[in-house]
């Protein structure tokens, strides 16, 4: 019987926890740009779980990458299939610059310290060549570019590109390694803001940032809800000199830097009761703060660790330090 999405998210959560990550509660917001936030030391992850990775479209990828830029965090999708095919273990896939791996690849990376070496591209399966090592081995063996090209079955120009760190097809790498008797590929570190791209795209697009015009795409996707409470909160934070970004498909309405991350949501007290644990959990994982703004009078300063302020309380604060001092006090920090 197929796993439910909730069970699968919980399995990914447990895998991260067992590897020493502090993981947020599953927030249950649908649709959402990410399902889990996880931190280990200085590494913060935003993880999205998808059955079929082809469901990740350009707009959703742009939202996820933008959140990764804002926190900042490494974004990662855990998938199961691409079309009708299972994702191969040990292979990194990409959609719109978002790195994607299978649950098995994640477990091997965390439990056995086995990083993936391969990445998928429309042209096949590739690996990134350790160019400096390849050049050193070629020179030491007294091989010319042409000689090694003949052994590998590629052009001299291809060998030059490999020595500059370009990717090569698995079959080509196998021929070179078989002849040299030495490995020449570089592992992919999933938790570094690195380049995980196929040869069909420029190699200077980091996986943790939106490619090309994605910033424009995100700006277009940001909602103009006309919600007076939300707009008032954003205007108030903006008036304090904070950079405020309105979010969509996230368990919070806005994100600001103070310079710590400040997650903010608006709504009724009933909504605050429903979302308090999730927001508080996300703020703790991000090593930031969170607050919930309501219209009605507040009789409880904190719900499940989340500071609750009404509009008038927010308006009393004229600068970020003053606001953060009250939030931290209510959080008990």
Protein language model annotation of sequence segments:
Residues 152-168:
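Recognition helix of helix-turn-helix/homeodomain-like DNA-binding domains
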Residues 142-156:
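Short alpha-helical DNA-recognition segment
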Residues 7, 12-15, 71-74, 79-80, ...:
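Charged, structured surface patches that assemble and position nucleic-acid processing machinery
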Residues 16, 34-69, 73-76, 237, ...:
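Conserved catalytic cores of phosphodiester-cleaving nucleases, focusing on short active-site segments
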Residues 135-136, 146:
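Residues within the helices of the helix-turn-helix
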Residues 171-186:
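DNA major-groove recognition helix of helix-turn-helix/homeodomain DNA-binding modules
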Residues 1-27, 183-250, 327-333:
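Acidic-basic catalytic patches of nuclease active cores, encompassing PD-(D/E)XK
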Residues 138, 149, 177:
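The alpha-helix within a helix-turn-helix
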């Amino acid at each position: 019987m197929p796993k439910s999405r909730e069970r699968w998210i919980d399995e990914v959560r447990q895998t991260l926890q067992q590897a020493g990550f502090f993981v947020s509660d599953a927030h249950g917001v649908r649709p959402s740009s990410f399902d889990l936030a996880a931190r280990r030391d200085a590494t913060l992850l935003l993880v999205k779980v998808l059955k079929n990775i082809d469901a990740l479209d350009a707009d959703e990828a742009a939202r996820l990458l933008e959140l990764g830029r804002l926190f900042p965090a490494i974004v990662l999708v855990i998938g199961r299939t691409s079309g009708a095919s299972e994702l191969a273990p040990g292979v990194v896939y990409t959609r719109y610059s978002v790195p994607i791996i299978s649950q098995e690849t994640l477990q091997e990376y965390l439990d056995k310290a086995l990083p993936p070496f391969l990445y998928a591209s429309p042209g096949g399966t590739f690996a990134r060549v350790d160019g400096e090592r390849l050049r050193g081995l070629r020179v030491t063996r007294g091989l010319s570019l042409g000689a090694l090209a003949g052994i590998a079955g590629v052009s001299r120009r291809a060998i030059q590109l490999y020595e500059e760190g370009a990717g090569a097809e698995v079959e080509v790498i196998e021929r070179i390694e078989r002849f040299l008797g030495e490995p020449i590929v570089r592992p992919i570190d999933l938790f570094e803001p690195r380049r995980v791209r196929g040869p069909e795209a420029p190699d200077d697009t980091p996986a943790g940032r939106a490619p090309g015009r994605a910033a424009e795409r995100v700006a277009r996707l940001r909602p103009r809800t006309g919600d007076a409470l939300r707009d008032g909160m954003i205007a108030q934070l903006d008036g304090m000199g904070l950079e405020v970004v309105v979010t969509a498909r996230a368990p919070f309405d806005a994100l600001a830097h103070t310079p710590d991350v400040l997650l903010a949501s608006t709504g009724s007290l009933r909504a605050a009761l429903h979302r308090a644990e999730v927001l508080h959990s996300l703020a703790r994982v991000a090593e930031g703060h969170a607050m919930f703004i309501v219209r009605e009078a507040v009789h409880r300063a904190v719900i499940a660790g989340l500071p609750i302020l009404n509009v008038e309380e927010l308006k009393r604060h004229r600068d970020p330090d003053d606001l953060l001092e009250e939030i931290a006090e209510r959080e008990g920090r």
